[in-house]
């Protein structure tokens, strides 16, 4: 894998939330810090970490640290955007505390994986290539987010 800029890593940290498995109307639920979390992750078993399956049909598994490094409370706002490939995405702005948490977490985990968990499912687990702080981009797979997925994410984050 080639080296990415901090912006690309943020995109890749992609909070790649394909919400196809979420029920319609999920955006109507109250904002809950447990809905979206970022965790340290590993392809290998780690004592006291839990194994989780990826949301998609791949059936892949990853080990995640039980305690989240960041959650919805660390996100200040979100707006529709485009990723570096022009796909539908969501631009996140972290709170001051969230930006500091992300900077510290990503700095300490360069070269390691971070799992993006939404409603108890692993959405993505990119490798952190450099420190990330105040902004990140949510994108998804090869085609980006659908309009419905983007709306749901915006509704949840901006509550």
Q: Where do the language-model regions lie?
A:
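Sec-dependent bacterial lipoprotein signal peptides
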Residues: 1-20
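Structural signature of multi-pass, alpha-helical inner-membrane proteins
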Residues: 2-4, 22-159
């Amino acid at each position: 894998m080639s080296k990415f800029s901090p912006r690309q890593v943020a995109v890749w940290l992609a909070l790649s939330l394909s919400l196809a498995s979420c029920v319609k109307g999920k955006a109507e639920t109250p904002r809950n810090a447990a809905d979206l979390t970022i965790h340290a992750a590993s392809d290998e078993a780690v004592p006291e970490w839990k194994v989780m399956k990826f949301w998609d049909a791949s059936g892949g598994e990853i080990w995640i640290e039980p305690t989240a490094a960041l959650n919805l409370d660390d996100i200040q706002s979100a707006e529709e955007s485009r990723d570096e490939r022009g796909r539908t995405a969501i631009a996140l702005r972290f709170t001051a505390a969230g930006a500091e948490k992300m900077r510290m977490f990503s700095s300490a985990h360069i070269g390691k994986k971070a799992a993006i968990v939404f409603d108890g499912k692993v959405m993505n687990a990119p490798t952190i290539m450099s420190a990330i702080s105040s902004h990140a981009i949510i994108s998804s797979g090869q085609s980006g987010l659908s309009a419905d997925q983007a709306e749901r994410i915006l509704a949840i984050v901006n509550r």
